[in-house]
UniProtKB/Swiss-Prot annotation:
This is Deoxyguanosinetriphosphate triphosphohydrolase. Belongs to the dGTPase family. Type 1 subfamily. InterPro entries: dGTP_triP_hydro_central_sf (IPR023293), dGTPase (IPR006261), dGTPase-like (IPR050135), dNTPase_1 (IPR020779), HD/PDEase_dom (IPR003607), HD_domain (IPR006674). dGTPase preferentially hydrolyzes dGTP over the other canonical NTPs.
C-alpha cells in the first residue's frame, strides 16, 4: 500500500485562477481562509436558514433549520478533526503523514465541508427529493430504456426514446434518463458549488463534500468493495468531466472517497441524532420524561455502567437533580449532548486513525460510526427512537405530504417549458418572450438568472449539427428546472405554489 502523505490530498489549487508560487504554511492557510469566506458568504448557505431539518415551515426559531443544524455539524467536525490531530501529534506521526504544516487546512476543510454538507437539499428535504424523482420517472421511465429499443417505451420525450441502429446515441439516452430521475442533495451540492455558484473552491475543499461516489446515471449493481460509498448518487452527468479532474487532482481511484469526508459524515451522524430528539421535545411531540422512557425501553437489556447509563442515564439523573424544574428540558439535552460527544468524538477519531490506510486510499467501505461497537449502537438507538416516535408522528407526516405535493405541483406548473420543441425553446431563450407562447414566456421569466445562464453556457458549447444535440439539450433543460425548484427555500416554494395555483392573491 502506498505511503500516507496528506500533502498529496490537501490540494490547494483551484479549477480557475489557481494561486501560484505558494510555499509557506501561512500562504497555504490563506488559500483555505479564502475558501471559508466564499462559502460562508454564499447565497446557498444563507438559504439554509429557511430549509427544513425535520419540521417544514416551522415558525418556532428554537427548532432547527438546515443552517443551524449545519453550524452544529461544523462544530462537531472541528472537534473530531482536532482530536485526530492531537492524537497523531502525541504519537509523533504528524510529520510522517505530511500533516505537520497542514493542521490548519485539515481543520478548515472539515469545518467547511460540514457547513456545506446540506446545501444541495431541495425544499422539504427527502420528500422534496422524492417528489422530483417521482415526477421525472413518471415521464421518462428510465426502466424502459434498460434493454433493446422497445415498441412500448413510455418516455414522453421522443428524442430520449431508444431507436434501432443508434447504439452510441442510445447509450447517451439511457444515461440521461437515469441521471435526471436520480436527483440527490449531495450531487446537487457539487453542482451548486462548481456549475451554478462558480465558487472556484480548492480541489481539497470540494473533495470534502463528495460524500457518495456513484454517478447518478449508474445502472445495475455496484461493486461489493464500494457498496457503502456508492449507495447513493454523488454527482451528475453534467459534472462528469469536473469530477474526473477532481479525482486526478486528489489522486482518487474510481469510486473512492476523499479522506476528510469521513469526518464530515461522522459529525453529521452525531449531530442530527440528538438534535432531532431535542426538536421533537420543543415541538411537544413528547416530553423529556417520555423520551427517556422511549430510549430506555428501546435499548433493551440494561447493566450498571453500560454506555446507556453513562450517557443517557447520567443525563436523566443530572437533569432531575436540578431544582429548577422549568429548565429540565434544557438541562437534559445539555448533558445528553455533552455525554454523547465525549464518548463518540474520541471513538470516531480513533476509528479514523486505526483505519487510516484504507481511509487515505478512499476505500474504507463504511462510516466511522458504523460497526458492532456500543457507540454505534447508541447512535442507532437515537435514530430508531426518532423514526418510531418523531418521523411517524401525524403532524410530521402531514407536513411531509404537503411538501411532496408542493414540489410536484411546481413541476406541473413549469412542465410547459419541458414540452416545448427544441427550436421553440431555443427561440424563447434567445428572445426571452414569444407572443405565441404567453404561458411559457412568463414561466421562463420567473426562472433565476443564474440558472438560465448556466443552461445557456453549456448548451451553447454543444455542436448543433450532432445527433447528440437534441438529447443533451433536453437533459440540460431538465437540469434547469430542477436547479430552480431545488434551490427554493421551503417558504418560497410554499408561497410560489399557492400563488401560481391561485390559492391566494
Amino acid at each position: 500500500m502506498a505511503s500516507i502523505d496528506f500533502r498529496n490530498k490537501i490540494n490547494w489549487h483551484r479549477r480557475y485562477r489557481s494561486p501560484q508560487g505558494v510555499k509557506t504554511e501561512h500562504e497555504i492557510l490563506r488559500i483555505f481562509e479564502s475558501d471559508r469566506g466564499r462559502i460562508i458568504n454564499s447565497p446557498a448557505i444563507r438559504r439554509l436558514q429557511q430549509k427544513t431539518q425535520v419540521f417544514p415551515l416551522e415558525r418556532n426559531a428554537a427548532v432547527r433549520t438546515r443552517l443551524t443544524h449545519s453550524m452544529e455539524v461544523q462544530q462537531v467536525g472541528r472537534y473530531i478533526a482536532k482530536e485526530i490531530l492531537s492524537r497523531l501529534k502525541e504519537q509523533n506521526r504528524l510529520e510522517e503523514y505530511g500533516l505537520d504544516a497542514l493542521t490548519g487546512p485539515f481543520e478548515s476543510i472539515v469545518e467547511m465541508a460540514c457547513l456545506m454538507h446540506d446545501i444541495g437539499n431541495p425544499p422539504f428535504g427527502h420528500f422534496g427529493e422524492a417528489a422530483i424523482n417521482d415526477w421525472f420517472r413518471q415521464r421518462l421511465h428510465p426502466e424502459d430504456a434498460e434493454s433493446q429499443p422497445l415498441t412500448h417505451d413510455r418516455c414522453v420525450v421522443s428524442s430520449l426514446r431508444l431507436q434501432e441502429g443508434e447504439e452510441n446515441l442510445n447509450d447517451i439516452r439511457r444515461k440521461v434518463r437515469q441521471d435526471i430521475c436520480h436527483f440527490e442533495g449531495n450531487a446537487q451540492g457539487i453542482r451548486l458549488v462548481h456549475t451554478l455558484m462558480r465558487m472556484n473552491l480548492t480541489w481539497a475543499q470540494v473533495g470534502g463534500i463528495l460524500k457518495y461516489t456513484r454517478p447518478a446515471w449508474w445502472r445495475g449493481p455496484v461493486p461489493d468493495s464500494h457498496h457503502y460509498l456508492m449507495k447513493k448518487p454523488g454527482y451528475y452527468l453534467s459534472e462528469e468531466k469536473y469530477i474526473a479532474r477532481l479525482r486526478k487532482e486528489l489522486q482518487l481511484a474510481p469510486y473512492s472517497r476523499f479522506p476528510l469526508t469521513w469526518i464530515m459524515e461522522a459529525a453529521d451522524d452525531i449531530s442530527y441524532c440528538v438534535a432531532d430528539l431535542e426538536d421533537a421535545v420543543e415541538k411537544r411531540i413528547f416530553s423529556v420524561e417520555q423520551l427517556y422512557h422511549h430510549l430506555y425501553h428501546a435499548w433493551g437489556h440494561h447493566e450498571k455502567d453500560s454506555l446507556f447509563e453513562l450517557v443517557v442515564g447520567n443525563a436523566w439523573e443530572k437533569s432531575r437533580a436540578n431544582t429548577l424544574s422549568r429548565s429540565t428540558e434544557d438541562q437534559f439535552f445539555m448533558y445528553l449532548r455533552v455525554n454523547t460527544l465525549n464518548k463518540l468524538v474520541p471513538y470516531a477519531a480513533q476509528r479514523f486513525i486505526d483505519n487510516l490506510p484504507q481511509i487515505f486510499a478512499g476505500t474504507f467501505n463504511q462510516a466511522l460510526l458504523e460497526d458492532a461497537s456500543g457507540f454505534s449502537r447508541l447512535l442507532e438507538l437515537y435514530k430508531n427512537v426518532a423514526v418510531e416516535h418523531v418521523f411517524s408522528h401525524p403532524d410530521v407526516e402531514q407536513l411531509e405530504l404537503q411538501g411532496y405535493r408542493v414540489i410536484s405541483g411546481l413541476l406541473d406548473i413549469y412542465q410547459p417549458l419541458l414540452s416545448l420543441s427544441l427550436n421553440d425553446f431555443r427561440e424563447l431563450v434567445e428572445k426571452e418572450r414569444l407572443k405565441r407562447f404567453p404561458i411559457e414566456s412568463r414561466l421562463f421569466q420567473k426562472l433565476s438568472t443564474r440558472h438560465r445562464l448556466a443552461y445557456v453556457e453549456v448548451v451553447s458549447k454543444l455542436p448543433t449539427d450532432s445527433a447528440e444535440y437534441p438529447v443533451l439539450e433536453y437533459y440540460y433543460r431538465c437540469r434547469l428546472i430542477q436547479d430552480y425548484i431545488s434551490g427554493m427555500t421551503d417558504l418560497y416554494a410554499w408561497d410560489e405554489y399557492r400563488r401560481l395555483m391561485a390559492v391566494e392573491q
